[in-house]
Curated annotation (Swiss-Prot):
Cellular compartments per GO CC: cytoplasm
Keyword field contains Iron-sulfur: no
Binding-site list for Fe cation: 196, 277
Encoding gene, per UniProt annotation: hemH
Annotated keywords: Cytoplasm, Heme biosynthesis, Iron, Lyase, Metal-binding, Porphyrin biosynthesis
Signal peptide start-end: none
UniProt record, GO biological process: heme biosynthetic process
CDD domains for this protein: Ferrochelatase_C (cd00419), Ferrochelatase_N (cd03411)
HAMAP family: Ferrochelatase
Localization annotation: Cytoplasm
Name of the protein: Ferrochelatase
Gene3D superfamilies recorded: 3.40.50.1400
Class of this enzyme: lyase
Origin superkingdom: Bacteria
Length: 388
């Protein structure tokens, strides 16, 4: 078959406190995170937002040791995957490509070309597809493939989502069962699935299949678990007053507390590695909300990380992908006919003198409004939570 490679995609995270500001800048520079009518405004606005949010984010990272463990865990997953693939008879080089921090996806691609990889499996470490996670990485890779001639000879295939993979479901069920056994009455514990949220408009206007895949994944895990426990699905990490997928995790915890739930185990359903949203948001912030709501026995299921059943599931995904017809980045970026990846081309105005004059006037008004908001502490960006 030739030299085989596997590219693991993930979000990335700051390794130390000094990295938080640059990481946030990279995050908000992504048009899939903040969409603006003028592309050249993206980076200045990203710099302003990152500058305002850095201190608060650093405090959160201090609570989990001063940095994100995501890179370390992802690299460990890669090493375990390489070993398991070898055990199953498939030798492969493993590469890690992060979207917003080192090692960047571009760095991984450079190494892939240097290593003369002939067959590549692109595997996002997001079980469920969303335009803001896997979709953003796929758009970047598609752009790199179009611009870099050295990538053209590589036969590649994409795994867009894999939440139905039996091994993944089994790993999640085993982790939940182990945590349930820590309670005096395991069958009476309420199972609380918490997924990373996205704005509701992503689903209703852009056709993002994320909510459907999360709901299906929850049902499949409960079916695999085969326990009588009641369960709830909620969405965390909402920012600002814009409506996101509901119910919100914080509200759902309060409601369960009001209903008299005392024993609860949280399942981070959209995360396969420990990071800020599991270690700080769930373990610290939501634990406090739960306890204040009367839920006194609060536990969390660990992320799969390098769980052997989970790693074997990833290996099976890779082997199956190599056997089946290739799935291209252009297909992955448009998984459904209705999915709109918000191409920035729609905002490119003609470069006429008149257009440039109006563009300049609008930009000036925008910057003036931004400066006024930064000085006064009030305005649209504060309302939606991008400035604090």
């Amino acid at each position: 078959m030739g030299r085989v490679g596997v590219l693991l995609l993930n979000l990335g995270g700051p390794d130390k406190l000094e990295d938080v500001g640059p990481f946030l800048y990279n995050l908000f520079s992504d048009p899939e995170i903040i969409r603006l009518p003028f592309r050249w405004l993206q980076k200045p606005l990203a710099w302003f937002i990152a500058s305002r949010r850095t201190r608060t984010s650093q405090q959160n990272y201090k609570q989990i040791g001063g940095g994100s463990p995501l890179r370390r865990i992802t690299e460990a997953q890669g090493e375990a995957l390489k070993k398991q693939l070898g055990y199953l008879g498939q030798e492969a080089n493993i590469y890690v490509g992060m979207r917003y921090w080192h090692p960047y996806t571009e760095e991984a691609i450079a190494q892939i070309t240097q290593d003369n990889i002939e067959h590549l499996v692109i595997l996002p470490l997001y079980p469920q597809f969303s335009i803001s996670t896997s979709g953003s990485s796929f758009r970047l890779l598609d752009k790199l493939w179009q611009e870099e001639p050295k990538l053209q000879p590589i036969e590649y295939t994409v795994i867009p989502s894999w939440y139905k993979q039996p091994g993944y479901l089994q790993a999640m069920a085993e982790l939940i069962a182990q945590e349930l056994e820590q309670f005096p009455n395991p069958d009476e514990v309420h199972i609380f699935f918490s997924a990373h949220g996205v704005p509701k408009s992503y689903v209703e206007e852009a056709g993002d299949p994320y909510q459907q895949e999360i709901e299906e994944c929850t049902a499949l895990i409960m079916q695999t678990l085969n326990r009588p426990n009641a369960h709830t699905l909620a969405y965390q990490s909402r920012v600002g007053p814009v409506e996101w997928l509901q119910p919100y995790t914080e509200d759902a915890l309060k409601e369960l507390g009001a209903q008299g739930v005392k024993d609860l185990v949280v399942v981070p359903i959209s995360f396969v590695s420990e990071h800020i949203e599991t270690l700080q948001e769930i373990d610290i912030e939501y634990r406090e909300v739960a306890e204040e709501s009367g839920i006194h026995n609060f536990r969390r299921v660990p992320a799969p990380n390098t769980h052997p059943v989970f790693i074997n599931a990833l290996a099976e995904l890779v082997i199956d992908a190599l056997k089946n017809p290739s799935f291209k980045l252009s297909q992955a970026a448009q998984m459904k006919k209705m999915v709109k990846m918000y191409p920035q081309e729609r905002w490119e105005w003609g470069l006429t003198t008149s257009a440039e004059v109006w563009n300049g006037r609008i930009a000036m008004l925008g910057f003036i409004a931004l400066i006024i908001e930064l000085i006064t502490g009030h305005g649209f960006l504060h309302m939606i939570g991008l400035l604090q």
